[in-house]
């Protein structure tokens, strides 16, 4: 499957950050179609994905069918916030999930992280950045907020976490593409603005927008990690950019 350019850049950064961390047990919250889980599995991790939408759950299981068959991975179609851990995990990660919660739900999510992480575990969040760039995609996806570095770090700190690392990702590529992205989303998905926040959130992991989330096969000649490696280096160079549309954050308990 051909991934969007922003997703490719995010996964490249994640893999680079985790390359020196010994693989262990992970949980991914809101797996969508399972691309981030696939990245972790390829690095030797084993774990569980949680997904509210049954169609996305099936897609994630199919995407990672070899790991499912070998017992290294499963997707549970349940609400993670209401689930107790079988055992602590070494890595707890979510991509474009936290912004779907209101303030109370956001606090509950971060408290649940405390119950799931092992004593030396690491939490990772990828969330929308640059509040100035709020747009149609936030509306149709059921977002409550976009984060600034300051607001994200303040929120984590206030709830007993310490930010170990924070970086802005996909800048400047996603910013250059944003007007086209907004146009494509408005044409394909504007009617979702009339849906409830819950329904918009549920559908956010299974979007099909030609030219944004789905591409003809030949585009894979360009949208791949080899061709996009220079843009990965550029995003690292500009990881301090305030207008970066994605924030990557690693966090641990404040007393560690």
List each model region and its residues:
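A short glycine-rich, Lys/Arg-flanked "PGG" loop and its adjoining helix->strand segment in the class I
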Residues: 107-122
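A short His-aromatic
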Residues: 99-101
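Feature marks short, surface-exposed loop/turn motifs that line or immediately flank catalytic pockets
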Residues: 56, 131-133, 170-173
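Hydrophobic anchor at the start of a short beta-strand
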Residues: 47, 163-164
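A C-terminal cap/extension of S-adenosyl-L-methionine-dependent methyltransferases
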Residues: 173-256
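Short alpha-helix
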Residues: 145-160, 166
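Conserved N-terminal segment of class I S-adenosyl-L-methionine
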Residues: 1-95, 109-110, 240-256
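Short, glycine-/aromatic-enriched active-site segment of Class I SAM-dependent methyltransferases
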Residues: 123-145, 154
